[in-house]
């Protein structure tokens, strides 16, 4: 399912045909300033590529149902609320059933042979290099990586701040499983993994799950962690467990 900024259904075949595609996967529960910083920085890098014409490109915020299942029973209203907030920020939103990134890329490849980009945080990149996600494939992780990186694809990696070491984790100091080291180095050295370096260091304390907890428990302060206009919509429509009666005084 795909929605445009106006909230109306879109046909992926029409929207994505022969387009350059940049996709951001997340739970967006709710969308935070960190999500939008990743979006802005990845978009700058993607559009700076010689092969990418911004006029012939689509950016998609993707929510996968497999993540929703991990949170328990799928609540249709909940993920439609997430999509609505993203649409209100002027974005295209796609709800898919693809757990693995290579399946998402294969799907996009049905519509285009142009450049593709995936923007993601460190945690998601670590998952890509985790063999357990590919045990169902006869060729294992190598088959998945062939399907993922064989295409004209780049991954834009948003850093993570390690609070204990007080350092940012990037593709340079990221630790992957010893068996994956050479594979990781191969894709990094071939320019498939690009670090997002021009990021906002002031917002790294913001996590969607923390915001969600603050909303549901009636704590103050979560509003400042969200993009402009999002908090007002959450309050107005009482999304994510928000209730005026539960606000602490």
Which residues does each PLM region occupy?
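Nucleotidyltransferase catalytic core that binds NTPs
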Residues: 1-249
């Amino acid at each position: 399912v795909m929605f445009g900024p106006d909230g109306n259904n879109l046909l992926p075949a029409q929207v994505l045909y022969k387009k350059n595609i940049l996709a951001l996967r997340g739970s967006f529960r709710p969308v935070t300033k960190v999500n939008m910083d990743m979006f802005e920085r990845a978009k700058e890098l993607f559009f700076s590529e010689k092969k990418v014409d911004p006029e012939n490109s689509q950016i998609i915020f993707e929510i996968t149902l497999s993540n929703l299942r991990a949170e328990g029973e799928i609540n249709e209203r909940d993920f439609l609320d997430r999509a609505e907030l993203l649409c209100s920020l002027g974005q295209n939103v796609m709800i898919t059933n693809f757990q693995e990134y290579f399946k998402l890329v294969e799907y996009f490849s049905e519509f285009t042979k142009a450049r593709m980009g995936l923007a993601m945080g460190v945690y998601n990149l670590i998952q890509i290099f985790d063999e357990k996600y590919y045990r169902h494939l006869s060729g294992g992780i190598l088959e998945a990586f062939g399907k993922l990186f064989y295409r004209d694809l780049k991954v834009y990696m948003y850093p993570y701040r390690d609070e204990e070491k007080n350092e940012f984790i990037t593709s340079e100091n990221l630790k992957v499983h010893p068996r994956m080291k050479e594979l990781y180095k191969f894709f990094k050295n071939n320019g498939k993994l690009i670090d997002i370096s021009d990021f906002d260091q002031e917002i790294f304390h913001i996590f969607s799950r923390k915001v969600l907890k603050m909303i549901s428990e009636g704590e103050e302060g979560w509003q400042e962690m969200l993009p402009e206009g999002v908090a007002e919509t959450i309050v107005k429509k009482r999304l994510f467990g928000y209730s005026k009666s539960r606000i602490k005084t």
